[in-house]
Amino acid sequence: MRFMQNRPFAANKAVSTALTLGLIVGVNACLSPLAVLARTSDLSALSGPAGFASEAAVGKEALHFGEGFKQMTPDQSKQAEALIKELDTINQNQRTNQSIDQVRRLGQEASKLYNAGQREPALSKWQEMYGLAQDIKYSEGEGEALSNMARFYVDAKQYVKAKYLGENAIELLANSSEQQTLAKARIALAQAYFGLDNPVWAIQQLDAALKILNLSQSKDPAEAASVMYLCASLCVQFNKPKDAIRFYQEAATYQTQANNYGEAVRIRATLVGLLIEMGWFTAALEEAEKVMSIAKTAPTDSNALQIPALQATANAQYALNDYAEARRTYDKLFALLPQIDQKMISEQVKANLNNGFGFVLAAIGDYDQAKQHLTAAFNYFKTVRDNFNAAQTANAIGVLEANEGNYGKSISMFQQAIDIHAVISPRAVKLNADTLLNMAAVEYRSGSFREAKLHLESAVAITAKLKNSSMRARLYQALAEILYKSSDITNAEANINKAIAEADKVKDDSILWRAYVMKSRIQKGRQEVDLAKESITSALSYFRSPQSGDFPTVDTLGFPVSREDMAYYLAEGLASNGMTEQALLAAQQLKEENFVMEWMRQGGQVKPEDKDVFLEMSSMRARLHSAEAASTPDQLTKEWQSWLERFRALSASNKSLARLISPMPVSIQEVLSTVQKNNAVAVEYLCGSEATLAFTVDSQGRISSTRIAFGRDRFKSQVRTLLASVNKTAGDTAPGENIRTVLASLYSELFPAGVRQFLPKTPDQMIVIIPDGPLFNLPFAALIDEKGQYLVQNHLLTMASSLTVLLDSSPAHNDDFSIVMASNQAKAELDQISNAVGPERVTVLQGKQIGLSNLEEQARGKSALHIPAKVAFPENNSLRSMLPFTVEVDGGARAISADRLFGSKMGNDLIVWSASSVNSKDGKGNALKIMSRGLGYAGARNVLMSLWSQPDAQRIDELVNFYKNKQAGMNPAQSLRKAQLAAISKDPDVKNWAGFQLLGPGY
């Protein structure tokens, strides 16, 4: 996890892939592509750079190579010429097989000494080898000796000496038949050039080595592969990743030719990691497919080789934000593990796999399983003192615990990570600072402001020498948030100013918007009205920047104040300064951000024709956010502009897909015209930690905002109590007083006078409720007003997850009332609805007919799709819920998860999910939000879902009346209201009639 610090999983898992392979099948794998330089092979003698740099370019340096390498002024006399001829004759006579073998033995002895760490004795042996080879005029031996001596000086960082040695080696080997030796010499020269900061000539030498190997059609492809791997490693070491790619590819090709499938898989897995590091995520996935192809065709150990291949694939999928597919890939991997000889699977392999799978599970919200896998990995890393991975994994577990509100456990894990950092060498400063920031964020949220301040001050101290304005700005901003909460306004403002100064240097909008929100709050507290308005206007400008968007990772908490709460302060500040329209748009942007992040986290699927664009655009956005951590935002301005141009084009051609990738700008005029066209009143809520904003938009073009003095946690508690009470009292004859009290309290809180004055006077005009967080799980129809009546008795209601749902709604798809019902159960429900509306209007799918493809075909042209399956949505990931539908796999049928529906085409006016139920612990309302938006993307205009499972008799009766009303020409909102009124007249108990929630425009 070392390539990209803010995407630790995506980077390190590729490295772990190579390590995993080495530990499973016994190849000489390494922890990173660079570690090959330390491998114990003959090639390890070629670890340096060189080329054709002039003496002026590299400077002069006295060289002492022994008596056999003296630079002398040539003697032009005839006696000298005759003497040379005579010596040549003598040397030719001395060059025998025995003398050549002696030269080679000296080289082998030198290599053994060098690999054993005895470098000086090795150098002496190579010098002796060179002298003997020169005596017998054995140029190949001379060249090999010089190459190895060049390696010695490269390792000693004496690059000028290494350069001259490498150049002489190439001159000696230029006309040699030993082309492999010449290729190695060129690599040695390339290493020297790299050391002299001459990468252009270094790459030329590596290219020349590659050409030699390709033209010579080496009889030893394994040796050629090793040379190519070394070339690739050098390119990585000296930051030439694009050049490294082709050398890795050549190395893998040679290893395949040599039937070394394990090495071929390892090299291509390493290449996957490099491509991920470079941000070429799609190319990484394509390369991972090649890894799997090699693994499957391996004549032996195929299953074992598929483990790193699957891991490489999961890495690429994770990098592409395709978290659901990454999860499925890991599921395949762990299903395959038992088929491998367990003796081949070391504890380190298990730790690597647990670590990778844990990060994927955390990304999709399966926190319990994620903690199990990460804890297993952490325990191993800690035992073997793999301190970096131990610290990073402990930090990730701490973030998981914090996300679940387990602050005590979270702080304990962060403290362990901090303690481990004390013994990490070299120091991982950024990871340490991130952990301290995470610790401070949790302490802030648990009320330990003093401890949070101390940990942030430690983070500021350890990063003081780093030339990283973004990091400094982030720490100053975090410290300001803690100081503000501690009422230390003076120091809070001082740190805000520091944060602004540092962030402005690198145009870091993600910090600037937060800093100006805080600055405005301080100024408003001092009654500096004009300055406060100026600051909040600046904050809004930065907030709208795509670079400031939220892109959370599984190992960071961001800031002490969550993005949701800081955005609430932004909206509240705008509204209090008379900028209500801008406040409403800021609230919309925040909600769209939250939806996009939750969609990606849960693994929402898209239509096949949209998948490539979706993955490319979303991964490009993720890559830009990741790159900001490695560089600075100002260096990525052109890339962001390019991304925005593509996003605008996509928004114009495929708006529904664009909304799954990033928030789209919305204008107030669009909002007003849509509300007026629908003759509706929109009531939108934005929940903060301490208070809530209620916006109203009516058909007369009026926009208002009202501050409600209750925050998110209060509503979460009330809704949870309500849902628990409803489920607990199932079967009772009357609603409990507790339920009525909660419903009446919620009405008075959510509909204060400032909101009620804009509500319609008659039920002929629609109210569109746009909730936030826990309010998604609230049955608004059942709220009890000051007269003791349910809200639905006086108003026509629908719910939308966002104003954009209204903006994007299309006209009715089909005026002809017809229903497709799909279920293997619920016969009574299907029969009663069919009898009520007429069997000729109902198509019932059962058994094998409920395949997804057939369902999609049968639903085409129908006005409604009815799904009576009982589905209880889990707390963290509703899309993992299993449905009664199937898809064909390998000639058989397999049940599918809820997310697969979104990739289909369901062009229906209405989809009814009649027996769903939400989890009372789902405090964000994600189940209804994600399911309704996903089905809307698939083509549905309205979605009717149930918050809890009503008693069957009352539920079916309400559904029958709903469809009768729909058949009579009413729209979905009118149909549901009339059915609920009929149910209330029979039994006013909330649990028996208020479970259904309509999401969509309502018409």
Stretches with model-predicted labels:
Residues 114, 126, 133, 153, ...:
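Eukaryotic all-alpha helical interaction scaffolds
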Residues 65-73, 85, 513, 529-788, ...:
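Amphipathic alpha-helical protein-protein interaction segments
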Residues 414, 773-776, 806-873:
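A domain-level signal for caspase-like cysteine endopeptidase catalytic cores
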Residues 104-115, 141-155, 181-195, 222-237, ...:
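Conserved alpha-helical positions within TPR/SEL1-like repeat arrays
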Residues 799-809, 864-961:
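Catalytic cores of nucleophile-dependent amide-cleaving enzymes
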Residues 551, 880, 887-906, 952-1003:
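Caspase-like cysteine protease fold
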